[in-house]
Amino acid sequence: MSHHVHPYSHRLGIIRDWKSRWFGVNKQFRNYFKADVLLREYLEKRLKGMYVAGIEMERSEKTLRVIIATSRPGMIIGRSGEGANKLREDVVKFMTRYNLEQSPELKIDIQEIKSPESNAQIVAQMIAEGLEKRMAFRRVMKQTIEKVMANRDVQGIKIYLGGRLGGADM
């Protein structure tokens, strides 16, 4: 019997990059790793519904740079940058509350995804949002397929839905 390897690990270095980029030794490595995992979980909860495709972290000796890729940067940034400043303050509070390894300087960069229909993570969030609004699952799937296939970059789409949809077992 063979073991299954996650496809993401095969793509690393070829078409994908690491989600965290830093170097640490022994105890420092453990602290950095714990900080990255907890901070990523916190940001995913905090930014739920804002179509965040990915969160990357880069660490150097003096800075921690958090890169948030989203299709709706205006929702995160807010009016005149108020939302970004509030997010930065919340991250600093979170890191001090859990005694996480802190860098002297924290930078939060927000990248816009130009075509959200070609990003699988955002498409999945759109489907989940439609289902949470109690829309019919067949309609949600058909609308999503039409929306995604209208994008020229996309060659095809495969959607898998499971569970009790419409009150029936699937």
Where would I find each of the regions flagged by the language model?
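RNA-contacting regions in translation and RNA-metabolism proteins
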Residues: M1-M170
